[in-house]
């Protein structure tokens, strides 16, 4: 098994978010894609990653290969990577994985392939009341600003706008609408409002680097879904349960 991806920063951004949620995870290298699904320690959030083989510079996978790893350890490896460097992940043995950071100098890491117990996660089919495509940078700024004053982020949807805000002693409100330019598209069935953990949203803000826009979907008493559609066909989905 051997795959090469041109920009190591993409994997770094994904693992950075993942490391905030779980201690261990499994990357599945299949014939047509690399996949990862992980449920956080408290079973409040879930992250799903699909990177099709077309995104990779090289992709040589004949049989499914599972790479179990410690997220913090892998993050330490990826931190040595610089801008525009590539990453090669290869294995000739089920017990270990070779990670090469390829740039002006090549760095090779021999990583033990861990036996990670995989949780049975049922297929989730949710019907949302609102789906909106908004600027990733705008979403990141909104969550960063709101999370500085509250533990709960309120997400509110109307027919023509999305609001991300803090309520209570300190009030902050960020509006996304077509008038302000932060809202690209909006699918609306009814007005909705929910509270979500500011900490859990702040933990995954590195995902906003994956695409210019993020599709957020939610509804009354329903999870918040963040969907990042990457250049080249990659997809990253993050689900977060509402506060009760």
From Swiss-Prot:
The keyword Heme does not apply. Keywords: DNA replication, DNA-binding. PROSITE patterns: PCNA_1. Pfam families: PCNA_C, PCNA_N. InterPro entries: DNA_clamp_sf, Pr_cel_nuc_antig, Pr_cel_nuc_antig_C, Pr_cel_nuc_antig_CS, Pr_cel_nuc_antig_N. Signal peptide: none annotated. One of its GO terms (biological process) is leading strand elongation. The keyword Zinc does not apply. GO terms for molecular function: DNA binding; DNA polymerase processivity factor activity. It comes from the Archaea. One of the sliding clamp subunits that acts as a moving platform for DNA processing. Responsible for tethering the catalytic subunit of DNA polymerase to DNA during high-speed replication. DNA polymerase I, DNA ligase and the flap endonuclease may be constitutively associated with the PCNA heterotrimer forming a scanning complex able to couple DNA synthesis and Okazaki fragment maturation. Heterotrimer stimulates the Holliday junction resolvase Hjc. Belongs to the PCNA family. Does not individually interact with either of the other PCNA subunits, but is recruited to a PCNA1-PCNA2 heterodimer; does not form homotrimers. Heterotrimer which circularizes head-to-tail (head is at N-terminus, tail is at C-terminus) to form a toroid; DNA passes through its center. Replication factor C (RFC) is required to load the toroid on the DNA. This subunit interacts with DNA ligase, RfcL, XPF, and weakly with DNA polymerase I. HAMAP family: DNApol_clamp_arch (MF_00317). This is DNA polymerase sliding clamp 3. It comes from Saccharolobus solfataricus (strain ATCC 35092 / DSM 1617 / JCM 11322 / P2). The gene is pcn3.
């Amino acid at each position: 098994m051997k795959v090469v991806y041109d920009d190591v920063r993409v994997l770094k951004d994904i693992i950075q978010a993942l490391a905030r949620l779980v201690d261990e995870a499994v990357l599945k290298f299949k014939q047509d894609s690399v996949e990862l699904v992980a449920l956080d320690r408290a079973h409040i959030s879930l992250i799903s990653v699909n990177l099709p083989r077309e995104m990779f510079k090289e992709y040589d996978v004949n049989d499914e290969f599972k790479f179990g790893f410690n997220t913090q350890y892998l993050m330490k490896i990826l931190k040595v990577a610089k801008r525009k460097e590539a990453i090669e992940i290869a294995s000739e043995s089920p017990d270990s994985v070779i990670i090469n950071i390829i740039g002006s100098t090549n760095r090779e890491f021999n990583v033990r392939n861990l036996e990670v117990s995989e949780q049975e996660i049922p297929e989730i089919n949710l019907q949302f009341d609102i789906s909106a495509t908004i600027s990733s940078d705008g979403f990141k700024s909104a969550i960063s600003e709101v999370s500085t004053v509250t533990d709960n982020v309120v997400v509110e949807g109307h027919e023509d706008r999305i609001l991300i805000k803090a309520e209570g002693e300190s009030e902050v409100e960020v509006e996304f609408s077509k008038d302000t330019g932060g809202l690209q598209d909006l699918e609306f069935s009814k007005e909705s409002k929910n509270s979500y953990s500011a900490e859990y949203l702040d933990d995954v803000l590195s995902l906003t680097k994956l695409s210019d826009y993020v599709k957020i979907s939610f509804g009354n008493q329903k999870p918040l879904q963040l969907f990042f559609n990457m250049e080249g066909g990659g997809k990253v989905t993050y689900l977060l349960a509402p506060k009760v």
